[in-house]
Each structure stands twice: as C-alpha cells, then as structure tokens.
C-alpha cells in the first residue's frame, strides 16, 4: 500500500473558535499551534499546510502562572543602534492583548513560508465578539 501524501487541493479546513478566558497562555498556545499545523489530522503531511482556521476570543483574559505577569518581558528591535524596546506582560495585555497570543503561537510554528501561511489562519480578538460567524466555527474546548 502506498503512503498517503496530502496535496493542497485535497486538504479540508475547518473553523474553530477558542475562548481564552482564564486559560494559561502556554497551554492554549501549544494546542492552537498543533491545530494550525494540522498534526491532529491523520492526513498530516509535513510539507503541506493541512491545518485548520482558529479564532481566539477573550485574548485580554489569558493568564500566566507565578510572577510572570510582572516579570515576563517582550523585546523588539528597530534595527538601529539603541533601538531595543521592551514591554512587560501587564502593559502589553492592557495595550495589545492579541499580540500576546500571536507571539506565543508564532514561536511554536515552523519558520519560513509554510509557517507564515499557517500563522495567517490564526485570528485573535481581545473581546468576546468576532466577525467570522459566516464560517460557522465550531467551539474547541481546550
């Protein structure tokens, strides 16, 4: 029997909605990254994007354990000398709560064109509302 290899034409993608209210950041991010890659499907193929679409709501209510809310720092650099910027978890959660989940999931995906295609299937919203009701997403309980 030949080994099955998925092709982009044969892949079926579902839409799932995840509620991040009260969930731990790392635990929710690993499950989202696995679903975006498609590793939960039997037809998973490493060089083909077989993952599903994931909608995350209530990103502002995601939690971290221990003292990470005060101690966790996110860095970015402009590329110019002295252009490093840092922001704590608490401040980032107040300013751009979507970025916390996006950054955690992006680090768990492959680097390169395939990883960027997988990351584009992630939709994160700070509040409880999203504008993807036409896709009829299923609730994914993590």
Swiss-Prot record:
The protein's name is Large ribosomal subunit protein uL13
| Residues spanning the membrane | none
Source organism per UniProt = Shewanella baltica (strain OS155 / ATCC BAA-1091)
Any one biological process term the GO annotation gives = translation
Please describe what this protein does: This protein is one of the early assembly proteins of the 50S ribosomal subunit, although it is not seen to bind rRNA by itself. It is important during the early stages of 50S assembly.
Q: Which keywords has UniProt assigned to this entry?
A: Ribonucleoprotein, Ribosomal protein
**Pfam families to which the protein is assigned, alphabetical:** Ribosomal_L13
Show the CDD domains listed in the entry. Ribosomal_L13
GO MF entry, a single one: mRNA binding
């Amino acid at each position: 029997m030949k080994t099955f290899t998925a092709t982009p034409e044969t892949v079926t993608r579902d839409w799932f909605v995840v509620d991040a209210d009260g969930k731990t950041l790392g635990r929710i991010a690993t499950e989202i990254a696995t679903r975006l890659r498609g590793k939960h499907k039997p037809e998973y193929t490493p060089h083909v994007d077989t993952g599903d679409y994931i909608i995350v709501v209530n990103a502002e209510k995601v939690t971290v354990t221990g003292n990470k809310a005060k101690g966790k720092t996110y860095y970015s650099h402009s590329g110019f000398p002295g252009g490093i910027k840092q922001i704590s978890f608490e401040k980032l959660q107040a300013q751009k709560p979507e970025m916390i989940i996006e950054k955690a999931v992006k680090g768990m995906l492959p680097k390169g064109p395939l990883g960027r295609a997988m990351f584009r299937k992630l939709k994160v919203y700070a509040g409880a509302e999203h504008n993807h009701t036409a896709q009829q997403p299923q609730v994914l309980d993590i």
